[in-house]
Amino acid sequence: MTQSALHTEFGGIAALRDALARRQVSAVELAQSGLDAAQAASGLNAFLHIDPDLTLAQARAADAALAAGTAGPLAGIPIAHKDAFVTRGWRTTAGSKMLAGYASPFDATVVERLAEAGAVSLGKLNCDEFAMGSGNENSAYGPVRNPWDTQAVPGGSSGGSAAAVAARLVAAATGTDTGGSVRQPAALCGVSGIKPTYGTVSRYGIIAFGSSLDQAGPLAPSSRDLLELLDVMTGFDPRDATSLQACDGQANESGRVRRGHDAAQAGYDAAGSQPLKGLRIGVPQEYFGAGLAPDVAAAVEAALAQFEQLGAVRVPVSLPRTELAIPAYYVIAPAEASSNLARYDGVRYGHRAAQYGDLNEMISRSRAEGFGDEVKRRILIGTYVLSHGYYDAYYLQAQRLRRLIAQDFQRAFAGQCDVIMGPVSPTVAKNIGDNRDDPTADWLADVYTLGVSLAGLPAMSVPCGFGGQDGRRPVGLQIIGNYFDEGRLLALADRYQQVTDWHQRAPVSQDA
């Protein structure tokens, strides 16, 4: 049995900020409590790197800023970062032996912005190797265990982030979502998580997997907490070539333009102040087919019924290419991974084999030793579909299909519905090792999240119940919006969380 961290006694981020301002608790006390809780819950394997000296130094700086009246909006809030974000002073491995011992000389933009806001990092969180996986079993440093049932996976690839939030070791965590890697672990661990519109949160300093798909997003117990984080994380970044410049707001001294308050916050305020009467919730028939487990279907149906009680209207919509998102994604994402991971050759950086003959053997052995099986599998797929003889037949066809998938969503939003809702995952969390002999089974777990990623839309996961044989494995509701509609999604989630308590429930024990 492990103790919860001290921050849980004060509620969400807003309440915690108020407690810090009133000196009811100090940032150092919160940080030390979080470190103690993380150590006690080490059996979850959620954390990869912890440095108490760095954490407590940040906490002391937050306390000083609070005392001086110069504190940022997240001053003293204990968080942690997925190990896919580079961090100055902390090791960054992306869950891979290839980057064992790597220390970045700079911070990712997301890390930098959260630090500027005063957040205190407790460490780096476990993840699937190079963010490739749906169960956090592909980490070179061992699987993460789900706090609700330690025999179960937490989801992936941001499994360490979801597990740490679910176990209440931190108030919030960062994650990345390429094909569902924030939403899926959030659902399986019973926490809230959001993937923003592609390009609204900087990718600078995220170790790349699929550059046209990767997007950073936060995980936290509630949608209100997510808004607090997204308000800081969102904004144009000239260091990221994919960062969107269509932002409102004033440039700060570093030249960056923040759009969080003017966009996500404004959308949240506008949607939150309006009654739900007449809100059209699109329910895709393709999300409720034979592959959806009955316990997941029941929990999602109950959530939809709750929204109807709040005044929303349920309307059927069709996303006919839902299942085709799987082959499209597993052509495009591996192709981009093959290109992005080509740099890890042991020459300039990355693991280098101890024994080799010529240069070619050194590169071959270094990559064979440094990469895990799933990463190798995707590199091979990507290299194949980008080869001269198959580029048109596979890669270009997948890109055409990607456009058609995006058009399906736009047809739904154009005149049929305001938001789309459905399950995040077709099942509750599987047991660790269940899919070891069939790695493609994990690919199918993302059938409801991949289309959103290919289209670049915002979507989030909200806890909506439990399933499984023992009834203690969480289920998540997916809420999908049109481009830049994060504020509305968060407001709708908040309305739901005002009348339900799924997001307030935490696992009693994190014994492994």
Swiss-Prot record:
Keywords: ATP-binding, Ligase, Nucleotide-binding, Protein biosynthesis. It comes from the Bacteria. Its EC number is 6.3.5.7. One of its GO terms (biological process) is translation. The active site is at K82 (charge relay system), S157 (charge relay system), S181 (acyl-ester intermediate). It catalyses: L-glutamyl-tRNA(Gln) + L-glutamine + ATP + H2O = L-glutaminyl-tRNA(Gln) + L-glutamate + ADP + phosphate + H(+). GO terms for cellular component: glutamyl-tRNA(Gln) amidotransferase complex. The keyword Plastid does not apply. InterPro entries: Amidase, Amidase_CS, Amidase_dom, AS_sf, GatA. SUPFAM superfamilies: Amidase signature (AS) enzymes. One of its GO terms (molecular function) is ATP binding. Allows the formation of correctly charged Gln-tRNA(Gln) through the transamidation of misacylated Glu-tRNA(Gln) in organisms which lack glutaminyl-tRNA synthetase. The reaction takes place in the presence of glutamine and ATP through an activated gamma-phospho-Glu-tRNA(Gln). Heterotrimer of A, B and C subunits. Belongs to the amidase family. GatA subfamily. This is Glutamyl-tRNA(Gln) amidotransferase subunit A. It comes from Bordetella pertussis (strain Tohama I / ATCC BAA-589 / NCTC 13251).
